[in-house]
Amino acid sequence: DPQTVAILKEAGIPVLRAELDSSAQGNIPNILLMGYVLGREDAAISLVNEIEDRLDFLSKKIPNTNQKRVLSITKWATIFAAGSNSTEGGIIEQAGAINAAAEVGINEHKEISIESIAEINPDVILLPQPRKGAEEFQKELLNHPVLLEVPAIKNQKIFYVHVPSAWVG
């Protein structure tokens, strides 16, 4: 928000805006930048090394055979799917699965319909949103006639993913 930036600068508070990247490794440059700005380069480098080590460990441990097609969706007023260039998509791929939304051409977060979920036909569905909304959405998905033959619905492979409240306001 340009007005907020102007107020902060006017008050003598330095303002730094980092590029937001939603991939699994995309915020590493931001961590290094913040370490530099805060005079904590060693801590930033240590954190980056830990992140890279963990990602490397995961990629070596997860076989690329029998990859599940995973769809990450949320429902607020409407349904949104996390495609390529999304945090959820990066996590799905890092875990050795296929981001089903990205596979059908969805980029970032896009609004989709119940019918689109049926067309995407995922093996697994993730619901990264507050528990109350996720539970209601899960019931809706499990009981929707259009989705009865979708593998994730048929096999009840719908999972709530805890979202820290700071993410949702």
Q: What are these regions, as identified by a protein language model?
A:
Residues 1-37, 111-149:
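Acidic/His-rich segments in extracytoplasmic proteins that coordinate ligands and/or metal ions
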Residues 81-109:
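Alpha-helical, coiled-coil/dimerization segments enriched in small aliphatic residues
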Residues 73-77, 104-105, 122, 130-131:
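Histidine- and/or cysteine-centered catalytic micro-motif in compact active-site loops
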Residues 62, 89, 149-151:
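Short secondary-structure boundary/capping segments
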Residues 144-160:
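Short glycine/proline-rich, acidic loop/turn segments that cap or connect secondary-structure elements
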Residues 32, 49, 71, 86-93, ...:
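Internal, well-ordered alpha-helical scaffold/interface segments
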Residues 3-77, 101-102, 156-169:
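Extracytoplasmic substrate-binding proteins
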